[in-house]
Amino acid sequence: MGKADKYWHIQMYKPEGKGGIEIDSMKMLQEPNPVIGTGEWDALDCIQFKDVENGTIVFVREGNKALALCEIIDEAFRSNELENKYYNTNYRHVKILAWAKDYKQPRPQLFSQGTFKSCKSSTEQYHYIDEWLKYIKIHGRRENATFSR
């Protein structure tokens, strides 16, 4: 993993947006082939989610709560089966690099609202993710780690 000029963060537990239904994002990450996802709407978040390169590091959260650090490993796709479960429209397969239970939570309000946002290297969000990646390098990742709330 080389040093990136930016990382991304995603929250996917409100696939219909504010005021809509809420899903358990952890279940998406615990699929046999873990996924992250977004809805389909006319916004930059959705376009960038579908276009971002494989190998991109993504911090997954529900509001201010960290869930996992992932790496995108496949192109964007749609799945009726996944959409029936999670109500998102667009999906990407990911490799789980680490679960948040094995690292510190971010400070409140560190990550902005929005579905899929970039974190440039000059931001505090970037440094949080970068420090987590360094922690993984030093302490290793737990291959078949399971998550418990």
Question: What is the meaning of each model-derived region?
Answer:
Residues 1-50, 98-102, 123-125, 131, ...:
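Compositionally biased, charged N-terminal/linker segments
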Residues 13-15, 61-65:
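Short, flexible beta-strand-to-coil junctions
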Residues 10, 70-71:
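GIY-YIG nuclease signature motif recognition
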Residues 36-37, 59, 67:
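Hydrophobic beta-strand signal
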Residues 65, 71-134:
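Aromatic- and Lys/Arg-enriched surface recognition patch
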